[in-house]
Amino acid sequence: MSYGAEQAVRDVSFSVPNGEVFAIVGESGSGKSTLVRAAFGMLKQASISGQILLNGTDISTLSDSDWRQLRGTKISMIFQNPSAYLNPNRTVENHFKDLFRAHGESYDVSRVIDMLNLVHLTDGERILQSYPFQLSGGMQQRLAIALSLILKPGIVFADEPTSALDMLVQASVLDLMKEVTQALGATVIIVTHNIKAAARIANSIGVMNKGQLVEVGSATEVMAHPKDEYTRILLDSVMKVV
């Protein structure tokens, strides 16, 4: 995968079993966010070789209209900073209504309140009448999780979903993501620079360095017995911070 003459990601191949969480770990510039954004159809300007398969279909070749139908119902994305894409002029309820309308579904308020309860936003009726800027950062990210899952996609991508949150909130949001996606049977591919956070939520971990996937294994194996020198450096840096 390249931009012009610059190759951002190369020779990357992995598969994720249904219902599991796969974490892609690496420093800024390692190519991890580029990889998931390509898989979500956000990098049309990139030159992509190879395939991105969803249930046997190469989704990298889809038209724009096909991508619009796919996002939300089959795949979804949780971004780093929800305040950057939640519309401050629209109530929370209108965000859900817009999403249902975009995919030709009738709005179901009881279904939405059930989802809000699932992400621990328990005062559903008040939340629906609120505007995003009236919610805390942690509540906004819980709302983003609810929006990404309300149409029951099979795969959820999460690009640094906790990096904009306070340390005390990060762990609870990660635990919530795992709890909710497991309850719904969704497969999760999460990108993070924090290998400790990856181990908290993931069944398996892939480590990226300079555009390549240098190590893949179960979370337990990667944390306890890293095979690649770069993985060991990431683990050492976490230990030094702790």
Predicted features, each with a name:
Residues 48-58:
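Conserved ABC transporter NBD signature motif
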Residues 58, 109-126, 235:
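Conserved ABC ATPase "signature" region
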Residues 59-76, 102, 222-226:
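ABC ATPase NBD coupling module
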Residues 131-135, 139:
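Conserved ABC ATPase signature
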Residues 150-154:
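A short, proline-enriched helix->beta-strand linker immediately N-terminal to the Walker B motif
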Residues 198-200:
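A short, surface-exposed alpha-helical micro-motif characterized by mixed small hydrophobic
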